[in-house]
Curated annotation (Swiss-Prot):
MF term (GO), any: transmembrane transporter activity
SUBUNIT field: The efflux pump is composed of EbrA and EbrB.
Descriptive protein name: Multidrug resistance protein EbrA
Upper classification of the organism: Bacteria, Bacillati, Bacillota, Bacilli, Bacillales
Species annotation: Bacillus subtilis (strain 168)
Keywords: Cell membrane, Membrane, Transmembrane, Transmembrane helix, Transport
Functional description taken from the UniProt entry: Part of a multidrug efflux pump. Confers resistance to cationic lipophilic dyes such as ethidium bromide, acriflavine, pyronine Y and safranin O. The efflux is probably coupled to an influx of protons.
Membrane topology: Multi-pass membrane protein
Designated gene of the protein: ebrA
GO biological process, alphabetically ordered: transmembrane transport
Length: 105
Protein backbone atom coordinates (compact mmCIF):
# COMPACT_ATOMS: atom_id res chain seq x y z
CA UNK A 1 0.00 0.00 0.00
CA UNK A 2 2.89 2.40 0.75
CA UNK A 3 4.21 2.07 -2.80
CA UNK A 4 0.76 3.07 -4.06
CA UNK A 5 0.95 6.30 -2.09
CA UNK A 6 4.46 6.94 -3.38
CA UNK A 7 3.17 6.56 -6.96
CA UNK A 8 0.20 8.79 -6.10
CA UNK A 9 2.45 11.50 -4.64
CA UNK A 10 4.57 11.51 -7.80
CA UNK A 11 1.38 11.71 -9.90
CA UNK A 12 0.10 14.68 -7.89
CA UNK A 13 3.41 16.57 -8.06
CA UNK A 14 3.99 15.95 -11.76
CA UNK A 15 0.42 16.97 -12.63
CA UNK A 16 0.82 20.20 -10.66
CA UNK A 17 4.13 20.96 -12.36
CA UNK A 18 2.51 20.30 -15.74
CA UNK A 19 -0.34 22.66 -14.87
CA UNK A 20 2.07 25.39 -13.79
CA UNK A 21 4.02 24.99 -17.01
CA UNK A 22 0.78 25.52 -18.97
CA UNK A 23 0.80 29.08 -17.70
CA UNK A 24 4.51 29.57 -18.45
CA UNK A 25 4.23 28.05 -21.95
CA UNK A 26 2.28 31.08 -23.21
CA UNK A 27 -0.22 29.03 -25.19
CA UNK A 28 2.44 26.49 -26.22
CA UNK A 29 4.50 29.23 -27.88
CA UNK A 30 7.54 28.49 -25.70
CA UNK A 31 8.89 25.02 -26.40
CA UNK A 32 10.69 24.25 -23.12
CA UNK A 33 7.71 24.86 -20.82
CA UNK A 34 5.48 23.17 -23.43
CA UNK A 35 7.69 20.07 -23.29
CA UNK A 36 7.43 20.11 -19.50
CA UNK A 37 3.63 20.19 -19.80
CA UNK A 38 3.68 17.02 -21.90
CA UNK A 39 6.25 15.33 -19.65
CA UNK A 40 4.44 16.36 -16.46
CA UNK A 41 1.03 15.14 -17.56
CA UNK A 42 2.42 11.95 -19.14
CA UNK A 43 4.25 11.09 -15.92
CA UNK A 44 1.17 11.97 -13.88
CA UNK A 45 -1.10 9.59 -15.79
CA UNK A 46 1.52 6.84 -15.83
CA UNK A 47 2.02 7.11 -12.07
CA UNK A 48 -1.74 7.22 -11.54
CA UNK A 49 -2.08 4.01 -13.55
CA UNK A 50 0.53 2.36 -11.30
CA UNK A 51 -1.29 3.68 -8.25
CA UNK A 52 -4.43 1.84 -9.32
CA UNK A 53 -2.64 -1.49 -8.80
CA UNK A 54 -2.47 -0.70 -5.08
CA UNK A 55 -5.24 1.76 -4.19
CA UNK A 56 -8.89 1.64 -5.38
CA UNK A 57 -9.88 3.96 -8.24
CA UNK A 58 -12.37 6.00 -6.20
CA UNK A 59 -9.80 6.78 -3.52
CA UNK A 60 -6.90 7.29 -5.95
CA UNK A 61 -8.70 9.63 -8.30
CA UNK A 62 -10.35 11.71 -5.58
CA UNK A 63 -7.02 12.11 -3.79
CA UNK A 64 -5.16 12.90 -7.03
CA UNK A 65 -7.63 15.53 -8.18
CA UNK A 66 -8.15 17.10 -4.75
CA UNK A 67 -4.51 17.23 -3.70
CA UNK A 68 -3.50 18.30 -7.22
CA UNK A 69 -5.93 21.20 -7.05
CA UNK A 70 -4.57 22.27 -3.67
CA UNK A 71 -0.94 22.03 -4.81
CA UNK A 72 -1.65 23.87 -8.06
CA UNK A 73 -3.34 26.63 -6.07
CA UNK A 74 -0.32 26.92 -3.78
CA UNK A 75 1.97 27.17 -6.82
CA UNK A 76 -0.27 29.84 -8.35
CA UNK A 77 -0.31 31.92 -5.18
CA UNK A 78 3.39 31.53 -4.35
CA UNK A 79 5.09 31.73 -7.77
CA UNK A 80 2.57 33.51 -9.97
CA UNK A 81 1.33 35.92 -7.27
CA UNK A 82 -2.30 34.94 -7.86
CA UNK A 83 -4.88 36.09 -5.34
CA UNK A 84 -6.64 33.72 -2.94
CA UNK A 85 -9.66 35.28 -1.29
CA UNK A 86 -11.52 33.99 1.78
CA UNK A 87 -13.92 31.84 -0.25
CA UNK A 88 -11.03 30.30 -2.16
CA UNK A 89 -9.19 29.55 1.06
CA UNK A 90 -12.28 27.91 2.56
CA UNK A 91 -12.63 25.81 -0.60
CA UNK A 92 -8.99 24.71 -0.40
CA UNK A 93 -9.41 23.80 3.28
CA UNK A 94 -12.53 21.78 2.43
CA UNK A 95 -10.65 19.96 -0.34
CA UNK A 96 -7.79 19.18 2.03
CA UNK A 97 -10.25 17.97 4.66
CA UNK A 98 -11.90 15.70 2.12
CA UNK A 99 -8.59 14.21 1.01
CA UNK A 100 -7.57 13.56 4.63
CA UNK A 101 -10.93 11.99 5.49
CA UNK A 102 -10.88 9.75 2.42
CA UNK A 103 -7.44 8.44 3.35
CA UNK A 104 -8.11 8.11 7.09
CA UNK A 105 -7.75 4.47 8.20
Amino acid sequence: MLIGYIFLTIAICSESIGAAMLKVSDGFKKWKPSALVVIGYSLAFYMLSLTLNHIPLSLSYATWSGAGTVLTTVIGVKWFKEDLNAKGLIGILLLLSGVVLLNWP
